[in-house]
Amino acid sequence: MSITAFDTKIPQEFSHSFLVDFSGLFQYLLRPLSEIDENVRWFGRRFEDYLLALQVNVHDRSGLYPQCIPYLFGMTICPFEEVLTFGII
C-alpha cells in the first residue's frame, strides 16, 4: 500500500516519494457540500494547508489504520500522528 501524506513534517527517512494524480480527489471535493459528509468537509478545509507539501510515501503501512474512512474515489484518509495521510487502496 502506498501512503500519501500532506505535510511538511514527514520524517527524512521517508525519502522515496513521487507525485500522484489527484484529479479524482479534486472532482470529489468540488461536489456540493450537502453531498459530502463532515469528515470530507473537514479535510477540504485542511487541504490548502497541505497541498504545497504533497508527497507520496511508498513504505508499506497496511493494517495500521483501522480507523480509516473510505472514500468513493477509491482512497482512504487515515490519521498518522499530526500528519494527514492517504492510503491508496
From Swiss-Prot:
Top-rank taxon, per record: Archaea
Protein name, per record: Uncharacterized protein AF_1386
Species: Archaeoglobus fulgidus (strain ATCC 49558 / DSM 4304 / JCM 9628 / NBRC 100126 / VC-16)
